Amino acid sequence: MNQERLLQVILAPIVSEKSTMIAEKNQQVAFRVAKDATKPEIKAAVEMLFNVKVDGVSTVNVKGKVKRFGRTIGRRSDWKKAYVSLVDGQELDLTATPAAAE
């Protein structure tokens, strides 16, 4: 897999009440990923970016909601969510700030 492609797979971490509970209970982390990303690509991207070992990947295609803007009806885009399970003993803290260089 191409390193440039792996950098485009992970779009953003999902920080919500549900994803936080899953992270604490099951050692899983939720990410918003590219619509055309495959499970092996997601696994390789997480291992490369965060230097952790991945046990498995589950994906969900989330349908966009229909929203109204006054009289106009619009629709949000569909997107893909990935739940990444980490190997026992591995930890991924997305809220930590990088250490400042002294």
From Swiss-Prot:
GO biological process entries = translation
Q: Indicate the secretion signal residues.
A: none
Q: Which InterPro entries match?
A: Nucleotide-bd_a/b_plait_sf, Ribosomal_uL23-like, Ribosomal_uL23/eL15/eS24_sf
SUPFAM superfamilies according to UniProt: Ribosomal proteins S24e, L23 and L15e
One Pfam family it belongs to? Ribosomal_L23
- Keyword annotations from UniProtKB, A to Z: Ribonucleoprotein, Ribosomal protein, RNA-binding, rRNA-binding
Write out the GO cellular component annotations: ribonucleoprotein complex; ribosome
Top-rank taxon, per record: Bacteria
**MF-aspect GO terms:** rRNA binding; structural constituent of ribosome
Explain the purpose of this protein: One of the early assembly proteins it binds 23S rRNA. One of the proteins that surrounds the polypeptide exit tunnel on the outside of the ribosome. Forms the main docking site for trigger factor binding to the ribosome.
Q: Which family does it belong to?
A: Belongs to the universal ribosomal protein uL23 family.
- What's the subunit arrangement here? Part of the 50S ribosomal subunit. Contacts protein L29, and trigger factor when it is bound to the ribosome.
Question: What protein name does the entry list?
Answer: Large ribosomal subunit protein uL23
Species, as recorded: Chromobacterium violaceum (strain ATCC 12472 / DSM 30191 / JCM 1249 / CCUG 213 / NBRC 12614 / NCIMB 9131 / NCTC 9757 / MK)
